[in-house]
UniProtKB/Swiss-Prot annotation:
Tagged with keyword Glycosyltransferase: no
Taxonomy of the source species: Bacteria, Bacillati, Actinomycetota, Actinomycetes, Mycobacteriales
GO biological process: cobalamin biosynthetic process
Pathway the protein contributes to: Cofactor biosynthesis; adenosylcobalamin biosynthesis
Pfam families with a match to the protein in the record: CbiA (PF01656), GATase_3 (PF07685)
Protein name: Cobyric acid synthase
Naturally occurring in which organism (per UniProt): Mycolicibacterium vanbaalenii (strain DSM 7251 / JCM 13017 / BCRC 16820 / KCTC 9966 / NRRL B-24157 / PYR-1) (Mycobacterium vanbaalenii)
Domain GATase cobBQ-type: from-to ranges: 252-428
Presence of the UniProt keyword Plastid in the record: no
PROSITE patterns noted in UniProt: GATASE_COBBQ
Classification via Gene3D superfamilies: 3.40.50.880, P-loop containing nucleotide triphosphate hydrolases (3.40.50.300)
InterPro entries to which the protein is assigned, alphabetical: Class_I_gatase-like, CobQ/CobB/MinD/ParA_Nub-bd_dom, CobQ_GATase1, CobQ_N, CobQ_synth, GATase_3, P-loop_NTPase
Gene: cobQ
Length: 490
């Protein structure tokens, strides 16, 4: 069994980037590589083909499978938690809806999830040469350690050597590295083989003394330092990344994406950010919509609750005014449902209010049902090919008003679709932007841009990390004789 766990000092430390780049670097060596994340907490997900229909996994693991040149499958992300509120998450197990968990009943439910997640790892390990597993958050969350099956709980199960990634751009990375190891039990410390520094800016010679001291103090090696790079873009899994997302270009047409509290699949607008004539911004105040050329209502895990938030902020009036002025509005999945006449959830699928009036811009009604739609649809819009993926409980009933649009309807300047990923299709995106904004086709290719970014990440990993040493580490048990750092776990 050959595998490696990429853990991190914190959330958003760079685990996903290192895992993705390492998958590409190892795939280039002719190895059959699979990514794996036992449990992902994200509302950014993707549908891939399963044995009996579509299955849902985290978007990051889908991209990592592309990096590994492997076919994405449910075993690569066996447990996906999709937060619907601060204390309640929808659980996807092996690609299928499993139920809901809250903070109060999580301890009881995770035993079954842990067993399924570790069985999925064992299945992959029997079919692939190398498994590059990604941890979640930090392995040193003292209050969560007893039931951990994602970080060192997985490493113990599979005997995985573990490398910890730290983001030096935030500061405090040496304390974070040392503290991560020192707060682990002796058994878990023995699994930590070393470190990777992420997002370093400046002269590596200035960092070298600190790395030598870290190796001396911990008895563990540093496997390399990834530089900060302005062109590193990947489908993200974490809403933390929204804080810095925009693609400012002077004189460009502005696309304002409403930053809903429970936003999901916000990668739907990444393709717009690729266009040279567009400036994509995330907005949470009505004033940000006033000068927008296109307003986007994205997907959400809690449609009715986020619609109430929209109204509480006055954003509903801003959207209505935008449409009344003849300027385009686009709703995707939950955002599409908000644009309709009414949303009904009589069975409490979303766990909140059972009914709400929509914005009334599209002649549709939405009813939530228990069964989740997981599909990979294809279609056309005015002779332009279109495709996407569907992940939703809402069933749309269109009225007589409106024209057809892929996965939805159009009424004048207002468009709605249930298809995520539709605008990753270059032909549909070009046609839509020409129709709505008069923006000429740029020739930009989103699939090529993603592949180029994955290759760039693979190049950076090859250049700045000791990939051969990491592969040797994955092929063997963790090094023997690693020193214990006090105090250990409380």
């Amino acid at each position: 069994m050959t595998g490696l766990l990429i853990a991190g000092t914190t959330s958003d430390a760079g685990k996903t980037a290192v895992t993705t780049g390492l998958c590409r670097a190892l795939a280039r060596r002719g190895l059959k590589v699979a990514p794996y994340k036992a449990q992902n907490m994200s509302n950014n997900s993707m549908v891939c083909a399963g044995d009996d229909g579509g299955v849902e996994i985290g978007r990051a693991q889908w991209v990592q499978a592309l990096a590994a040149r492997a076919t994405p499958e449910a075993a690569m992300n066996p447990v996906l938690l999709k937060p619907g509120s601060d204390r309640r998450s929808h659980v996807v197990l092996m690609g299928r809806p499993w139920g809901h968990v809250s903070s109060s009943d999580w301890l009881e439910g995770r035993r079954a999830l842990a067993a399924a997640a570790h069985a999925a790892y064992d299945d992959l390990a029997g079919r692939y040469d190398v498994i590059v597993a990604e941890g979640a958050g930090s392995p040193t969350e003292i209050n969560l350690r007893a039931g951990d099956y994602v970080n060192l709980g997985l490493a113990r199960h599979a005997g995985l050597p573990t490398v910890v990634v730290g983001d030096i751009d935030r500061g405090g990375v040496f304390a974070a590295f040392f503290g991560t190891v020192a707060l682990l039990s002796p058994e878990d410390q023995a699994l930590i083989a070393g470190f990777v520094v992420n997002k370093f800016r400046g002269d590596p010679a200035l960092l070298a003394p600190g790395l030598r001291d870290l190796e001396r103090l911990t008895g563990r090696r540093v496997y390399g330092t990834l530089p900060w790079h302005p062109d590193l873009w990947l489908d993200s899994e974490d809403a933390l990344e929204l804080q810095g997302r925009r693609s400012a270009r002077p004189g460009a047409r502005r696309v304002a994406v409403v930053r809903l509290p429970r936003i999901s699949n916000f990668t739907d607008v990444d393709a717009f950010g690729l266009e040279p004539d567009l400036d994509v911004v995330f907005a949470s105040h009505p004033s940000a919509l006033a000068d927008a050329d296109l307003v986007v209502l994205p997907g959400t895990r809690s449609t009715i609750a986020d619609l109430a938030w929209l109204r509480s902020r006055g954003l509903d009036r801003a959207v209505l005014a935008h449409a009344a002025a003849g300027r385009p509005v686009l709703g995707i999945c939950g955002g599409f449902q908000m644009l309709g006449r009414v949303i009904r959830d009589p069975h409490g699928v979303e766990g909140g209010t059972s009914e709400a009036d929509g914005l009334g811009l599209l002649d549709i009604e939405t009813d939530f049902v228990a069964d989740k739609a997981l599909r990979l649809p294809e279609g056309q819009w005015e002779a332009t090919s279109a495709s996407g993926y569907e992940i939703h409980h809402g069933r749309i009933t269109p009225g007589p008003g409106g024209d057809e649009f892929p996965g939805g309807v159009r009424c004048g300047p207002v468009f709605g679709t249930m298809w995520h990923g539709a605008f990753e299709g270059d032909a549909l995106r070009a046609r839509f932007l020409t129709e709505t904004l008069g923006v000429p086709a740029s020739g930009a290719s989103f699939p090529k841009a993603r592949e180029d970014r994955i290759d760039l990440l693979g190049d950076l990993v090859e250049e700045h990390l000791d990939v051969d040493a990491l592969l040797r580490l994955a092929e063997h048990a963790p090094p023997q004789g690693l020193p214990f750092l006090p105090p250990g776990s409380p």
